[in-house]
């Protein structure tokens, strides 16, 4: 199977998992990126089965609306049963690196609200130790140099992501050459740097369920 076929398979598996648990008042949290887009496309076939969605980015909101799925502001939603999103890396404990698409802050907020966080990914994203994929950090622009110096002290090699502004108007620094053996601790350390909005480690609030696309089919991992 190609990578696109694996993404479509896990997207469909996520729809199959949540659909029996949805009703006409349900609102679904939706992530950002190519795998999340596959999920949106699969979910759209069942848009009569739920009320609408909360989007983690402007791009996701536009895709949902294009399918005729109502999009709600998170502040107007009191309960979010599911959040479905992809990942750049996952370990076996379902700690994630996310943010390759620069939507990490809004993704992390929606994930924090959701009762169940379902991560969907192809098998290449499952790794023994996080960090081969550069760790994105969203930063207030005036703090870029300060944050970069602090990231060096933590052992990383920070690289400014040229030409990218987040939906929140901030910049991204990608931290290379990190072997992340304690993701919960590192997430807190980076978030404590003045000028950091958040970083792409999802370890304090990891995924609850990982649907992993492999050549043998979709595998389900839980914490």
Curated annotation (Swiss-Prot):
Gene3D superfamilies in alphabetical order: 3.30.70.260, 3.40.50.1360
One term under GO cellular component: cytosol
Pfam families: Rib_5-P_isom_A (PF06026)
Enzyme Commission identifier(s): 5.3.1.6
Enzyme class of the recorded protein, top EC level: isomerase
Residue sites binding substrate per the record: 32-35, 85-88, 98-101, 125
Active site per UniProt: 107 (proton acceptor)
GO molecular function: ribose-5-phosphate isomerase activity
Pathway info: Carbohydrate degradation; pentose phosphate pathway; D-ribose 5-phosphate from D-ribulose 5-phosphate (non-oxidative stage): step 1/1
Annotated keywords: Isomerase
Functional note: Catalyzes the reversible conversion of ribose-5-phosphate to ribulose 5-phosphate.
UniProt subunit comment: Homodimer.
Name of this chain's protein: Ribose-5-phosphate isomerase A
Protein's organism: Pseudomonas syringae pv. syringae (strain B728a)
Protein's gene: rpiA
């Amino acid at each position: 199977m190609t990578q696109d076929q694996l993404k479509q398979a896990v997207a469909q598996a996520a729809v199959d998992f949540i659909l029996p648990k949805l009703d006409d008042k349900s609102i679904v949290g939706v992530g950002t990126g190519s795998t999340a887009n596959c999920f949106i496309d699969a979910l759209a076939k069942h848009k009569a089965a739920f009320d609408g969605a909360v989007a983690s980015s402007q791009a996701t909101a536009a895709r949902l609306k294009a399918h005729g799925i109502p999009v709600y502001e998170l502040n107007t939603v009191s309960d979010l049963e599911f959040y479905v999103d992809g990942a750049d890396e996952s370990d076996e404990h379902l700690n994630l690196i996310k943010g390759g698409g620069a939507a990490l802050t809004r993704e992390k907020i929606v994930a924090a609200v959701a009762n169940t966080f379902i991560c969907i990914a192809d098998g290449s994203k499952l790794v023994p130790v996080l960090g081969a994929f550069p760790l994105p950090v969203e930063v207030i622009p005036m703090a870029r140099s300060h944050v970069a110096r602090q990231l060096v002290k933590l052992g990383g090699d920070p690289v400014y992501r040229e030409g990218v502004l987040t939906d929140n108007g901030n910049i991204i620094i990608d931290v290379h050459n990190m072997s992340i053996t304690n993701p919960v601790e590192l997430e807190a350390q980076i978030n404590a740097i003045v000028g950091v909005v958040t970083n792409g480690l999802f370890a304090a609030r990891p995924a609850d369920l990982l649907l992993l696309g492999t050549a043998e089919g979709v595998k389900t991992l839980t914490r």
